[in-house]
């Protein structure tokens, strides 16, 4: 292992569970790069300005940002990438000699795993469960890269769905966003792509259920669909299992995890992450856990 000269890290609240240190430190070791990635837990949003000033003062090379700080950090970096501006959120910060660039690699995290299915998605309806930041990243990836005939948001609170749509339409009035209640079964069944952009199904997280769809709603899934669950732990969520049983193409959340990490890694190091090797190692790690 080479001598460590640069620090990378993750800022968030109660994020000791994160697999990001494993991914980035494994990649750095494989490529013999002098980077070490660690976790910085921040208890309160009011500490973000001090944290980023500390990043400048200490020469921390780069940071990932996770919930609940992806929006607030946009106010304290020096520049925002086009992607970060599009979704109003930063998940990656690059320190360029004290000048902090805020970027968003979540959009690439959604887009990259869908590349093999581009023709299937073009001018076909796509659906997203959720109305938060992850859903917004999914909307932007679909709008920018895949041009579906409709982007349907399936939400429990239509007002929140409308707020997200208004945010997108402020910059892209042509975006084909449609708002549906969570029980709009015909609209769900008609989607060629369904993305779970909620934390439902995450190991150890208390939510209203453990799947984006209830067991009795499995009949809505079929072999003409692509099912993408952003949740990566557990590897096989109830939603993924339902989709596999229905014969759908399944994209597990680990693919988004790796894709967004690879994009961040390249921004910090200028190097290409060995994603196939990383995928093999993280799948082994996720499979081995109790």
From Swiss-Prot:
It comes from the Bacteria. GO terms for biological process: amino acid biosynthetic process; aromatic amino acid family biosynthetic process; chorismate biosynthetic process; shikimate metabolic process. The keyword Transmembrane does not apply. Keywords: Amino-acid biosynthesis, Aromatic amino acid biosynthesis, NADP, Oxidoreductase. Pathway: Metabolic intermediate biosynthesis; chorismate biosynthesis; chorismate from D-erythrose 4-phosphate and phosphoenolpyruvate: step 4/7. Shikimate binds at residues 18-20, 66, 91, 106, 232. Pfam families: SDH_C, Shikimate_dh_N. Its EC number is 1.1.1.25. The keyword Cytoplasm does not apply. It catalyses: shikimate + NADP(+) = 3-dehydroshikimate + NADPH + H(+). GO terms for cellular component: cytosol. The active site is at residue 70. GO terms for molecular function: NADP binding; shikimate 3-dehydrogenase (NADP+) activity. Coiled coil: none annotated. Belongs to the shikimate dehydrogenase family. Involved in the biosynthesis of the chorismate, which leads to the biosynthesis of aromatic amino acids. Catalyzes the reversible NADPH linked reduction of 3-dehydroshikimate (DHSA) to yield shikimate (SA). PANTHER family: BIFUNCTIONAL 3-DEHYDROQUINATE DEHYDRATASE_SHIKIMATE DEHYDROGENASE, CHLOROPLASTIC, SHIKIMATE DEHYDROGENASE. Homodimer. This is Shikimate dehydrogenase (NADP(+)). It comes from Prosthecochloris aestuarii (strain DSM 271 / SK 413). The lineage of its organism: Bacteria, Pseudomonadati, Chlorobiota, Chlorobiia, Chlorobiales. The gene is aroE.
């Amino acid at each position: 292992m080479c001598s460590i000269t640069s620090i990378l890290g993750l800022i968030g609240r109660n994020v000791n569970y994160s697999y990001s240190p494993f991914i980035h430190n494994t990649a750095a070791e494989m490529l013999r790069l002098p980077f070490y990635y660690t976790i910085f837990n921040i208890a309160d949003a009011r500490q973000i300005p001090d944290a980023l000033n500390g990043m400048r003062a200490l020469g921390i090379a780069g940071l990932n940002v996770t919930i609940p700080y992806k929006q607030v950090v946009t106010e304290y970096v020096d520049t925002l990438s086009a992607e970060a501006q599009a979704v109003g959120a930063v998940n990656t910060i690059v320190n360029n000699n004290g000048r902090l660039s805020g970027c968003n690699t979540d959009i690439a995290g959604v887009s990259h795993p869908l590349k093999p299915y581009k023709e299937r998605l073009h001018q076909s309806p796509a659906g997203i469960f959720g109305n938060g930041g992850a859903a917004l990243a999914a909307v932007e990836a679909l709008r920018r890269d895949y041009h579906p005939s409709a982007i349907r948001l399936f939400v429990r609170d239509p007002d929140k769905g409308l707020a997200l749509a208004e945010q997108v339409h402020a910059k892209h009035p042509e975006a084909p966003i449609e708002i549906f209640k969570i029980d709009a079964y015909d609209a769900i069944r008609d989607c060629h792509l369904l993305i779970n952009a909620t934390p439902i199904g995450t190991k150890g997280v208390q939510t209203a259920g453990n799947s984006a769809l209830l067991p009795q709603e499995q009949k809505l899934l079929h072999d003409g669909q692509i099912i993408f669950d952003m949740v990566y732990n557990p590897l096989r969520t109830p939603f993924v299992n339902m989709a596999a049983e229905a014969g759908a193409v399944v994209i597990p959340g680990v693919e988004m995890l790796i894709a967004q990490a690879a994009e961040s890694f390249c921004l910090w190091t200028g190097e290409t992450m060995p994603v196939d090797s990383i995928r093999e190692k993280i799948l082994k790690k996720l499979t081995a856990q109790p």
